[in-house]
Design a protein with these regions (language model features):
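Conserved Class I S-adenosyl-L-methionine
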Residues: 191-256
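A short acidic, Gly/Pro-enriched loop at the edge of an enzyme's catalytic core
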Residues: 99-111
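A short glycine-rich, Lys/Arg-flanked "PGG" loop and its adjoining helix->strand segment in the class I
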Residues: 126-141
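Short, glycine-/aromatic-enriched active-site segment of Class I SAM-dependent methyltransferases
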Residues: 15, 147-169
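Short alpha-helix
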Residues: 170-186
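Conserved alpha-helix/loop element of class I SAM-dependent methyltransferases that forms part
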Residues: 21-39
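Class I SAM-dependent methyltransferase SAM/SAH-binding core
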Residues: 44, 50-100
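Class I SAM-dependent methyltransferase Rossmann-like catalytic core
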Residues: 9-23
């Protein structure tokens, strides 16, 4: 598959990017701060990708994580990364469909799902969130990390460019619409943080990947003509829309 055909996160991963979330480490750290995790916690990570977040959770809290994805390459990378850290007893990597989770009701203390809900239409978002609600224990927390409109939806032209840039039917919402999504699915409380997207900004790249990592990504992004066209197209679009698009991190609490 050429650089121009890959999904946005797959293309960035091929350049060496390890933080594939719109708010990078800033948003993920905020989610961690809201998690109330302990070594006894049972965690489900949906769309685990290469298991970067799952590994950090276990290293920090000593919890047990079930890391699921549908992409075979992502699962292979996740298993390799978990094995490299010697964390196979703490992280269980498996293929599973987020719409029909293979877990009983009230199974997890925390469900974490970063940069996935944005990729679905609003009705599909609600179906996924309802499934996360089902498997959470009473008092459990859903931690999500997505893209939001800062004021109103993009114009048709800009929305079309966004879909073209990331090669996915991206469907962000406003801050209030994200809140209402979780409340309407039964959550009792929704805490939120939003900020500048770090995915393609120079400052965000350095913060998320380190200086050497950022240099490597930019070098790989400019190295071939296909990569260069795709990389610059993504960079220019997100830069032009930096005031209209933010990351949003939400901690939604299930009632006891």
């Amino acid at each position: 598959m050429s650089a121009t055909e890959k999904a946005g996160h797959t293309f960035l991963a091929s350049l060496g990017k390890t933080r594939l979330r719109p708010g990078g480490v800033e948003a993920t750290e905020w989610l961690f701060s809201q998690s109330q995790l302990t070594s006894n916690s049972q965690v489900l990570e949906v769309a685990c990708n290469m298991a970067t977040t799952a590994i950090e959770l276990v290293q920090r809290y000593g919890c047990t994580v079930y890391a699921i994805d549908m992409d075979k390459t992502a699962l292979e990378n996740a298993r390799n990364n978990v094995a490299a850290k010697g964390l196979e007893n703490h992280i269980h990597v498996m293929a599973a469909n987020a719409n029909i989770l293979p877990f009983a009701d009230n199974s997890f203390d925390v469900v974490i799902n970063e940069a996935m809900l944005t990729m679905y239409a609003d009705k599909a978002k609600a179906k996924l969130v309802a499934e996360y609600f089902r498997v959470l224990k009473p008092g459990g927390r859903l931690l999500t990390h997505d893209i939001m409109f800062t004021a109103q939806k993009l114009g048709a032209g800009e929305q079309g460019q966004l879909v073209e840039v990331v090669k996915s039917n991206v469907s962000p919402m406003t801050r209030q619409a994200w809140r209402e999504l979780f409340l309407n699915c039964g959550f009792e409380q929704v805490l939120q943080q939003n900020g500048d997207m770090s995915l393609m900004s120079p400052r965000g790249l350095i913060r998320d990947e380190g200086l050497a990592g950022a240099i490597k990504i930019v070098f790989n992004g400019l190295r071939t003509s296909d990569n260069r066209r795709r990389f610059l197209k993504m960079f220019r679009f997100f830069r032009s829309q930096r005031h209209q698009l933010n990351y949003i991190a939400c901690c939604s609490v299930k009632g006891k």
